[in-house]
């Protein structure tokens, strides 16, 4: 949700329909939000939570809960800005917080309830592109939960693990702890990632999946890498970085077809140089005669 969306919401809540000065009386707003202890996965490092990339994961978020750094209390920010907007339009508002309703409770809601306002998200392929091209952690975390229809990160992570197993992807040693990779408890091998890339290249939405990635020397987190090299514009990938760890995985297009590449560096002194060397070798590598 952006600030413009909040303004539209305030107008709808006051019954103005976009006009000023036609308030119907005090506005009572109940925000159904996760309790604070659920805003971050438990194993996210406390230092990460102060930065935009470690912003709290809430159901209703303004500007992805980031404003320079992370917004430490998204609910209070929403309350403050909503009250200010309603007051600016000549109204008053009372805001209270409640727990989110469950899927069961949603099905039990009365049919006579009326939706006053709805904010539609960007299309799925745009959200996936934000997560993969720009490594936007908040979006990645929300996509994990929405895909599993489970806001509990442990349940959502278990659902992702089961899906990979159902696809025939080797999951030995795999541990999914969150959606963004910021947790130090994630465990994955380059074999698993390469197998996932190959499987997704056969998926009905393969074109959308590849288009969601950064492009070497052109776009996203790879925009400043491999410029002027043979792989510029020919490698679609996803990068990952936490303290001491550097990873890159993706699809390298060659004259002999696609190569599914995954590299994970732990504690290397110059990982980017090594990654570049390996990508160039793979690009120039011809397939074995027996595989043609």
Where are each of the predicted segments found?
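Extracytoplasmic
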Residues: 24-26, 39, 55-57, 77, ...
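Secretory-pathway/luminal and periplasmic proteins that interact with or process carbohydrate-rich
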Residues: 37-39, 137-140, 221-222
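Periplasmic/cell-envelope proteins involved in peptidoglycan metabolism and beta-lactam response
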Residues: 1-66, 76, 80, 291
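Extracellular/periplasmic catalytic domains that process cell-envelope and extracellular macromolecules
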Residues: 21-23, 51-54, 121-124, 168, ...
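Short, glycine/proline-biased beta-turn/loop segments that scaffold the active-site neighborhood
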Residues: 31-48, 91-110, 215-217
